[in-house]
Amino acid sequence: MKRLICIFLIVVPAQLAFTQQLPLFDQYLYNKFLINPAHAGSDGYTSFNMTAREQWVGYSGAPRTYSLSLQTRILKRGYKIRKTIFNQTVFTPKNDGKVGLGAYVFSDRNGLIRRTGFQATYSYHMWLQKSTQLSLGLAVTGYHFIINVNELSFENPSEPWLSSNLRRGVFVPDMDFGIYVLNPRFDFGFSALQLFEAAAKIGDKTYKNFRMDRHFYAFGSYHLITAPGMEFEPSVLFKISEQLMPQADIGITYIYDQRLWAGLTYRTGGGLITNIRFRYIPDHSKWTALYFGYAVDFTLSEIQKVTYGTHELTLALKFGDSTRKYRWLDRY
């Protein structure tokens, strides 16, 4: 057991202190729920988003991330069944429309560390003005960390503790919070992730040097309509945590007829991101739209000599009808 503790105290903190603790995404512009829980249900649709990301292709042990997210808005209109004292069934209107729900799971490999995470989100939406919406979101999160023992060497790999405790890993719970403001012309938000900075518990002890650092995100964008069917959207995202240097993404996205998106983003610290996205609207279908996205992240640092860049694929499916979606919010 002591060897297990030593491995976690040396390998795990080193991995987490100098690499990203949270999954990194390039196409968050099209699914802000990944960085802000308040976004859940803000556009009135029910949407599914899938992402596959391969970071630093060609570099051994580089991060590889897969994620699946779901978000929805509770119907404004509808009815619920209520039993009266005479056991009669009565349909009464639901007093909803301001509540959003979301869920998010991911699997991430980063060097020797493999982790699986989940998030369950509750959001509340209210109108500040006729066309400006304020959203608040709170999420319960959990992360399961495990060391890939196949990439480690031991004198006696058949020891019992190696096959049980080490393979089982550790579970770290936490919470996220977010604020999001949405208007037809602009949007901005702030989120704080891993609020409690939870520490891993190995055996009967909690090790504070292996803890989840609090992360802060601030995002903003503005919508410019230059001609019928042609739009530009400049955006900026600031990220900061206790272990990593502040980082910013500064980008511009071209939108054509709400069917084609093409973007270019500069990431401080040495990164250039290009992305493209298409929307397909099938005839006589139950879903509203199907979205395909692809992004390439070119690293401008020394690591570019041994990699083929970072590649990210996304697939999104949106459901909605006139009773649950807000058409002026349908920007993506």
Label each region the model flagged.
Residues L4-A14:
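Sec-dependent N-terminal signal peptides
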Residues Q15-T19:
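Sec/Tat signal peptide C-region and signal peptidase I cleavage site
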Residues M1-I5, Y332:
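Short, Lys/Arg-enriched, disordered terminal segments
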Residues Q20-Y332:
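Subset of outer-membrane beta-barrel
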